[in-house]
Amino acid sequence: MLKREMNIADYDAELWQAMEQEKVRQEEHIELIASENYTSPRVMQAQGSQLTNKYAEGYPGKRYYGGCEYVDIVEQLAIDRAKELFGADYANVQPHSGSQANFAVYTALLQPGDTVLGMNLAQGGHLTHGSPVNFSGKLYNIIPYGIDESGKIDYEDMAKQAETHKPKMIIGGFSAYSGVVDWAKMREIADSIGAYLFVDMAHVAGLIAAGVYPNPVPHAHVVTTTTHKTLAGPRGGLILAHGGNEELYKKLNSAVFPSAQGGPLMHVIAAKAVALKEAMEPEFKVYQQQVAKNAKAMVEVFLNRGYKVVSGGTENHLFLLDLVDKNLTGKEADAALGRANITVNKNSVPNDPKSPFVTSGIRIGSPAVTRRGFKEAEVKELAGWMCDVLDNINDEAVIERIKGKVLDICARFPVYA
């Protein structure tokens, strides 16, 4: 018999200490990594539930195990909410991650060796869009597209590459691009050569759900996303489609199970269902609008302080600082800001002379700070503090002073009150 009062603290002090330290770190550090966010206690309640005990290979109503009558309800709720939220008529909520979702799409639509047009990782793309170190770059013939001198996606070049190489699939989406993607234009290019358009909207799914960023679902053959990041749910993946192509939907389902995965994580699927319901609330739209406002407000401060922002601004939740002119590396900036309890990530910038392990830039995102209640006034102050640190990267007195301000504002805006 398992006793409900069993706990980690009394059993595994070493593990519990690390968990508690991470809890403190999240409360006392300002989180600006664009792909990170804080999920709600409701989501965590679902993830810590007895649903974790249940094997449920297959799909609702078509399971390989008995005893699935209640997890069927859970998964169907998640499916229905995903379809409603994004205007899709197909949803698969089983992928364990965004990368797993992407892998399933490749498996469903392509054969190894097929040509794929994807955004260059060094110019804002993602590992799974064709990086040579990733399965996508190893199994498929990847042709990269990128951005023009203004920092915007170069659709003219994309169309030329498509016409020249005749890819079977074109990938839209990004991990470090601050603009708005023209999904309709990408579909037009894909249709001109008979290619699939696959969009990975992981970074902007929350903005899309709230109507703050254009929805790719009406334009793409297939769309994937993570359920964390701007969507603020559990760590996991999701596949969506629209258009009624039942043959495609069957291929996608088979590519997830049994091709790529076995049993789904039912506790995580329940958490996805909760997060999708939260994303339908009016306050979620207000939150996403503030995410976009906060990113713009931060950009304004950095530009006024003489910092170069890739593309000169942002139209979503993130932006890149190009530190080449400041003679700083992304690695140095990341470390100095970290000492002031401000968490960012080093990131390559267009035509970066440094390696991906050093880089010449940092990526900054507003979802997490907005989640804890920061508005324009707070993020402008924060951006100023970041400039103070970057202007005095070797001055520990300045860094300590900023750290004190960070601790103060974190206490005033707790993540979990």
From Swiss-Prot:
It catalyses: (6R)-5,10-methylene-5,6,7,8-tetrahydrofolate + glycine + H2O = (6S)-5,6,7,8-tetrahydrofolate + L-serine. InterPro entries: PyrdxlP-dep_Trfase, PyrdxlP-dep_Trfase_major, PyrdxlP-dep_Trfase_small, Ser_HO-MeTrfase, Ser_HO-MeTrfase-like, Ser_HO-MeTrfase_PLP_BS, SHMT-like_dom. The record marks H228 as: Plays an important role in substrate specificity. The modification N6-(pyridoxal phosphate)lysine is found at K229. One of its GO terms (biological process) is glycine biosynthetic process from serine. Pathway: One-carbon metabolism; tetrahydrofolate interconversion; Amino-acid biosynthesis; glycine biosynthesis; glycine from L-serine: step 1/1. It comes from the Bacteria. (6S)-5,6,7,8-tetrahydrofolate binds at L121, G125, H126, L127, S355, P356, F357. Its cofactor is pyridoxal 5'-phosphate. It is an enzyme of class 2 (transferase). GO terms for molecular function: glycine hydroxymethyltransferase activity; pyridoxal phosphate binding. Keywords: Amino-acid biosynthesis, Cytoplasm, One-carbon metabolism, Pyridoxal phosphate, Transferase. Its EC number is 2.1.2.1. It is found in: Cytoplasm. Pfam families: SHMT. One of its GO terms (cellular component) is cytosol. Catalyzes the reversible interconversion of serine and glycine with tetrahydrofolate (THF) serving as the one-carbon carrier. This reaction serves as the major source of one-carbon groups required for the biosynthesis of purines, thymidylate, methionine, and other important biomolecules. Also exhibits THF-independent aldolase activity toward beta-hydroxyamino acids, producing glycine and aldehydes, via a retro-aldol mechanism. Homodimer. Belongs to the SHMT family. PANTHER family: SERINE HYDROXYMETHYLTRANSFERASE. This is Serine hydroxymethyltransferase. It comes from Enterobacter sp. (strain 638). The lineage of its organism: Bacteria, Pseudomonadati, Pseudomonadota, Gammaproteobacteria, Enterobacterales.
